[in-house]
């Protein structure tokens, strides 16, 4: 995932926003 709780474009598209 991305850093600092910010999901990448792919993660947002796939719904993997477990960092938000």
From Swiss-Prot:
Annotated stretches, region: Disordered: 1-20
Swiss-Prot/TrEMBL keywords: Membrane, Mitochondrion, Mitochondrion inner membrane
Keyword match Membrane: yes
Signal peptide: none
One Gene Ontology biological process: oxidative phosphorylation
GO CC entries: mitochondrial inner membrane
Keyword Metal-binding included in the entry's annotation: no
Function as written in the Swiss-Prot or TrEMBL entry: Component of the cytochrome c oxidase, the last enzyme in the mitochondrial electron transport chain which drives oxidative phosphorylation. The respiratory chain contains 3 multisubunit complexes succinate dehydrogenase (complex II, CII), ubiquinol-cytochrome c oxidoreductase (cytochrome b-c1 complex, complex III, CIII) and cytochrome c oxidase (complex IV, CIV), that cooperate to transfer electrons derived from NADH and succinate to molecular oxygen, creating an electrochemical gradient over the inner membrane that drives transmembrane transport and the ATP synthase.
Family: Belongs to the cytochrome c oxidase subunit 5B family.
Subunit relationships: Component of the cytochrome c oxidase (complex IV, CIV), a multisubunit enzyme composed of 14 subunits. The complex is composed of a catalytic core of 3 subunits MT-CO1, MT-CO2 and MT-CO3, encoded in the mitochondrial DNA, and 11 supernumerary subunits COX4I, COX5A, COX5B, COX6A, COX6B, COX6C, COX7A, COX7B, COX7C, COX8 and NDUFA4, which are encoded in the nuclear genome.
Identification of the protein by name: Cytochrome c oxidase subunit 5B heart, mitochondrial
Organism ancestry: Eukaryota, Metazoa, Chordata, Craniata, Vertebrata
